[in-house]
């Protein structure tokens, strides 16, 4: 046989060999839907991205892989840069200080590398500059956090001790006019007056105070004068009340001690009498203490009692009413909460700080100082560490060997080396995965049979065509399928999986014709037509039936029964459809001989499908400007000739635009949508039916036939820089395009004969199809996204046994 060329996965039947063809692969415990799903998902690290790519439709694997790969690579560089900068800032105080001094400016790494820096045009990702900013903000936040904790701690200590000190004096001594005043200086003054033990040791530790701060948000004052005034304003009356209470208690104790000492000698009796005194009701004791103080003011108490009261009043502060009023009227400036480092970072920086590519720059990733210790490895620069982390995920041999190589790479060649090394290692790994995937794919019997049926194979698709061709050729001679006789043709049809697929295709194609005829009758006729009527009068039976007709002894397949659930056909119609399909299969017997139903018989199906997808070999017309246009015109004329019978059955007298539309959809193998007047079309595509066996109930898998998406070419991608697409990127549409040159339509001579031809060939019907409409239909067919091989199969089907008109 001739060399088979595989151009895309939709070509029948050898498109199944394409790397993006959906042939399930079960490898260990994982399932892949195609070869490229296996290859590209295993090029990614284990995780969510890999699982997502495994489940991605093959048509979107490459574009999705490029996006994921870019994201993963960018994440690795960001993470590596952040780690290296943080370690460098902890190791080198000069680096740390230089980084902190850039705040709050935006840091820009001026490098031609558009991934690490901003590039020559300033549009790069600036990952290194952003990493510097992030580490700077983290360091500043840590510094601010420590300062904030200290401020909260000192504010709490100062407030607590000021409240204690207010009981002894009015705190005026701590009011300062010094511009350098601070809470820290206020606490130092309190320590000087009361001692460190009294100020700090009797207070909670900093962790307890921060816990209290989280619960009640301790106000952090930066101005000690404001704190002093707010303490006096809020607590002066409470201080007075507490001091007065303790004064009354002290006066009462002094009076009782004096009275008892005058009348009682024994100490035991003194203690008992004093205890009895405090058993008196509180209200009466308060009244008694007030009278004692009144006597003190009147200077009517003994000197012993007066001295005790004077000493107490000298130790504690008893503010006057005018002082209280003054303190409560004082204006206090409440501190405004300071913006956090995160809030400051979100604001638009007013200026930009530029880090140069020069290795002499302190913040440059190429700066050589002491070796950078990261993950127990020493790297000359930050850039060497980033290059190591990026290349590590593709390394096929030794990670240690990669490290030994990278640390010796000169700075000036590091970027170019990294790009080349990543691309080479990824290509090597991809080829290994490709061979693994194809090896697993060849375990599928139907794939093995396709390869067995041909002598030579070549790939011209977009997924490593040269390497794929070499791998298949490597295995072609090793495939040996035993020729085993099959007892009967019926058993062959019933049990062979490959024949099931052929039957399903024939059934689906028949119902495509049926659906288009139904839409056609709805558009052209005003009365209702049933699907059974269309089966009985279908004008395309002559294209399907050949010379002899045999009634199958097999039951109607469950697939056909299930397909009928949408149509409601009678048993008679189903028998007719199954007879048509069955006899189509029987025609192959003429090629291999009756009773030779073996693997060679199935090869006839394969080659029949393949040859139907090749160029049309029948006698051509000479009315269009290109051979391809003539082929399409011939098929449309053939379909219109059969539609003439439909029109005559229903008593219509003309062929019009509706007939032309039906012919176009039939040639494309698509179902035309019926849109009632005033309604919008239902754009939902019909489901594709999938069954494991022709005689089993199939499962419904929604796999709509849609226009192919624009695909992205896999290009040589740099290690640090984002993927740049080639100027002439791959467009999947080119694989579906069906033209040899620009569409030109009818030649001048044919235009003159067109009307005469239609009048004679389609008589007695009147022709209302205009020449531009016919040209538009041919042009639409040629530019359709349906694969060329599928178009050829449809054209060959409709041209079979058609009498080529003489135009």
Curated annotation (Swiss-Prot):
SUPFAM superfamilies reported for this sequence: YbiA-like
InterPro entries given in the database record: YbiA-like_sf
Gene3D superfamilies: YbiA-like (1.10.357.40)
Family, per entry: Belongs to the IIV-6 155L family.
Name under which the protein is recorded: Uncharacterized protein 113L
Species this chain originates from: Invertebrate iridescent virus 3
């Amino acid at each position: 046989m001739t060399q088979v060329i595989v151009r895309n996965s939709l070509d029948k039947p050898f498109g199944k060999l394409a790397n993006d063809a959906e042939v399930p692969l079960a490898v260990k415990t994982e399932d892949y839907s195609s070869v490229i799903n296996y290859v590209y998902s295993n090029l990614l690290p284990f995780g969510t991205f890999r699982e997502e790519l495994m489940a991605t439709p093959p048509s979107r694997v490459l574009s999705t892989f490029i996006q994921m790969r870019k994201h993963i690579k960018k994440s690795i560089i960001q993470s590596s840069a952040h780690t290296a900068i943080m370690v460098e800032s902890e190791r080198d105080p000069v680096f740390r200080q230089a980084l902190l001094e850039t705040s709050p400016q935006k840091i820009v790494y001026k490098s031609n590398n558009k991934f690490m820096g901003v590039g020559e045009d300033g549009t790069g990702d600036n990952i290194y500059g952003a990493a510097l900013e992030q580490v700077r903000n983290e360091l500043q936040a840590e510094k601010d956090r420590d300062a904030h904790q200290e401020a909260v701690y000192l504010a709490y200590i100062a407030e607590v001790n000021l409240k204690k000190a207010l009981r002894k004096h009015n705190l005026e001594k701590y009011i300062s006019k010094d511009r350098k005043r601070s809470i820290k200086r206020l606490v130092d003054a309190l320590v000087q007056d009361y001692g460190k033990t009294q100020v700090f040791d009797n207070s909670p530790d900093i962790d307890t105070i921060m816990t209290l701060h989280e619960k009640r948000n301790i106000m952090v004052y930066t101005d000690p004068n404001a704190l002093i005034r707010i303490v006096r304003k809020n607590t002066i009356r409470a201080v007075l009340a507490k001091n007065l209470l303790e004064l009354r208690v002290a006066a009462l104790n002094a009076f009782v001690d004096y009275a008892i000492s005058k009348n009682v000698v024994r100490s035991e009796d003194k203690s008992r009498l004093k205890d009895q005194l405090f058993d008196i009701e509180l209200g009466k004791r308060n009244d008694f203490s007030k009278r004692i103080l009144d006597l003190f003011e009147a200077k009517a108490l003994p000197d012993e009692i007066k001295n005790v009261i004077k000493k107490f009043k000298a130790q504690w502060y008893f503010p006057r009413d005018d002082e209280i009023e003054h303190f409560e009227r004082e204006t206090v400036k409440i501190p405004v909460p300071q913006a956090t480092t995160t809030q400051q970072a979100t604001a638009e920086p007013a200026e930009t700080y530029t880090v140069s590519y020069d290795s002499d720059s302190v913040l440059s990733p190429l700066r050589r100082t002491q070796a950078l210790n990261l993950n127990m490895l020493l790297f000359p620069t930050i850039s060497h560490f980033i290059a190591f982390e990026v290349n590590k995920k593709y390394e096929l041999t030794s990670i240690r060997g990669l490290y030994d190589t990278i640390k010796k790479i000169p700075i000036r060649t590091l970027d170019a080396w990294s790009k080349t090394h990543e691309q080479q290692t990824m290509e090597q790994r991809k080829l290994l995965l490709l061979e693994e995937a194809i090896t697993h794919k060849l375990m599928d019997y139907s794939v093995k049979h396709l390869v067995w049926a041909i002598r030579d194979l070549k790939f011209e698709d977009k997924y490593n065509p040269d390497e794929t061709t070499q791998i298949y050729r490597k295995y072609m001679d090793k495939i040996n399928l035993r020729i085993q006789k099959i007892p009967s043709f019926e058993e062959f049809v019933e049990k062979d999986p490959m024949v099931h697929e052929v039957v399903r295709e024939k059934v689906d194609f028949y119902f495509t014709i049926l659906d288009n005829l139904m839409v056609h009758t709805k558009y052209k006729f005003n009365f209702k037509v049933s699907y059974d009527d269309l089966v009985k009068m279908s004008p395309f039976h002559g294209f399907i039936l050949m010379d002899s007709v045999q009634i199958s002894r097999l039951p109607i397949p469950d697939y056909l029964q299930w397909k009928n659930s949408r149509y409601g056909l009678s048993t008679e119609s189903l028998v007719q459809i199954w007879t048509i399909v069955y006899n189509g299969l029987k025609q192959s017997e003429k090629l291999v001989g009756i009773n030779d139903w073996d693997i060679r018989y199935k090869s006839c199906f394969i080659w029949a499908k393949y040859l139907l997808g090749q160029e049309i070999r029948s006698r051509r017309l000479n009315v269009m400007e290109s051979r391809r246009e003539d082929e399409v015109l011939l098929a449309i004329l053939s379909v219109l000739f059969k539609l003439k019978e439909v029109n005559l059955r229903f008593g219509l007298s003309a062929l019009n635009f509706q007939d032309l539309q039906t012919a176009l959809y039939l040639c494309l193998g698509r179902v035309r949508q019926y849109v009632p007047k005033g309604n919008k079309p239902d754009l939902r595509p019909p489901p594709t039916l999938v069954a494991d066996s022709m005689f089993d109930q199939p499962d419904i898998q929604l796999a709509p036939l849609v226009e192919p998406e624009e695909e992205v070419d896999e290009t040589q991608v740099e290690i640090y820089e984002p993927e740049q697409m080639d100027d002439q990127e791959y467009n999947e549409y080119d694989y579906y395009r069906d033209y040899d040159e620009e569409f030109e339509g009818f030649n001048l001579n044919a235009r003159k004969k067109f009307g005469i031809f239609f009048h004679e060939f389609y008589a007695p019907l009147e022709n209302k199809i205009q020449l531009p409409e016919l040209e538009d239909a041919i042009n639409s067919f040629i530019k359709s996204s349906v694969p060329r091989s599928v178009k050829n199969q449809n054209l060959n089907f409709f041209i079979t046994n058609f009498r080529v008109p003489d135009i």
